[in-house]
Swiss-Prot record:
Sequence positions that bind substrate: D108, F119, L120, A121, Q122, Y133, Y134, Q135, C153, I164
Cofactor binding annotation: Can utilize both FAD and FMN.
Subunit structure: Monomer in the absence of bound substrate. Homodimer; dimerization is triggered by binding to FMN or adenosylcobalamin. Heterodimer with MMADHC.
Listed cofactors: FAD; FMN
Function noted in UniProt: Cobalamin (vitamin B12) cytosolic chaperone that catalyzes the reductive decyanation of cyanocob(III)alamin (cyanocobalamin, CNCbl) to yield cob(II)alamin and cyanide, using FAD or FMN as cofactors and NADPH as cosubstrate. Cyanocobalamin constitutes the inactive form of vitamin B12 introduced from the diet, and is converted into the active cofactors methylcobalamin (MeCbl) involved in methionine biosynthesis, and 5'-deoxyadenosylcobalamin (AdoCbl) involved in the TCA cycle.
UniProt similarity note: Belongs to the MMACHC family.
Gene: mmachc
Protein's UniProt name: Cyanocobalamin reductase / alkylcobalamin dealkylase
Highest taxon listed in the record's lineage: Eukaryota
Molecular function terms from GO: cobalamin binding; cyanocobalamin reductase (cyanide-eliminating) (NADP+) activity; demethylase activity; FAD binding; transferase activity
Length: 250
């Protein structure tokens, strides 16, 4: 049985509030909206009206979830600490809020046996209304010709200072006709800005200038920047230097 948009919001309210306190945001959408813009090879294998939820992390996640997680939990040495924190936080909130629901969770880093990602994160961000996915197709006369340029999502309040973390699918929840799709905010409006965005993301991504393509209400703290600028293989040493990991967790 399909549920109304009001019931969707009621279902997600406590979950939304719990994750917000940890520095995450959620954006619900129908599986059919996602499948409609992709080839069959990338479809999510659920009925079109099935409720899905995209989870993103905001700058607050680092201080509100990640650092407390490091203080209270043992990090597995072979897994990325941020990924562990995200999985731990989502698992706890799902268990608390959806004890009687079947929720399938896919993380942004997970791959299928075919080596395709479990879901296309930026497409999900766009169809859910979380962030506009800017691609070469959004530019009338690309100055780089046939050169491959990857697209990037921009959040209307956070610019590029966020990350897509997970996709939840509520296997037995169908959203009704009243649950309408919301277009993402087109906050990079001019062709010149879009060109600058894609060039910054593809050619100068290390300087992070693409993240400031629009004014952001919040940005990563200096400590968070230092963590993400550090090469992945050296981040555990940095966490030990900060006092968050013991030698047995290295």
């Amino acid at each position: 049985m399909a549920i109304s948009s009001e019931r969707v919001e009621e279902l997600l309210r406590t979950f939304r509030e719990s994750l917000k306190a940890k520095g995450f945001e959620i954006y619900p959408f129908k599986v059919g909206w996602y499948n409609a813009v992709l080839t069959a090879a990338h479809h999510l294998q659920y009925p079109a009206d099935t409720l899905a939820v995209l989870v993103i992390s905001t700058p607050a996640m680092f201080e509100c979830a990640f650092l407390p997680f490091l203080q209270s939990q043992s990090c597995e040495s072979l897994r990325d600490p941020i990924d562990q924190c995200t999985a731990h936080t989502l698992s706890a909130c799902i268990s608390l809020c959806f004890a009687n629901q079947f929720v399938d969770v896919s993380y942004d880093y997970e791959m299928l046996p075919s080596r395709k990602p479990k879901f296309l994160a930026q497409t999900a961000a766009h169809v859910s209304g979380a962030a506009y996915y800017y691609q070469t197709s959004d530019i009338h006369n690309p100055p780089w010709g046939e050169k491959k340029m990857f697209g990037v999502c921009v959040h209307p309040q956070l610019g590029g200072w966020f990350a897509i973390r997970a996709l939840l699918v509520f296997r037995d929840v169908q959203a009704g006709a009243g649950f309408q799709q919301r277009d993402p905010a087109d906050c990079v409006c001019t062709q010149e800005e879009r060109i600058r965005l894609l060039e910054s993301f593809n050619l100068r991504w290390r300087d992070w200038s693409y993240r400031d393509i629009v004014p952001a209400e919040d940005r990563y703290s200096d400590q968070q920047k230092q963590y993400f600028i550090t090469p992945p293989g050296q981040r555990r040493a940095l966490l030990r230097q900060w006092g968050y990991l013991t030698d047995t967790q290295s």
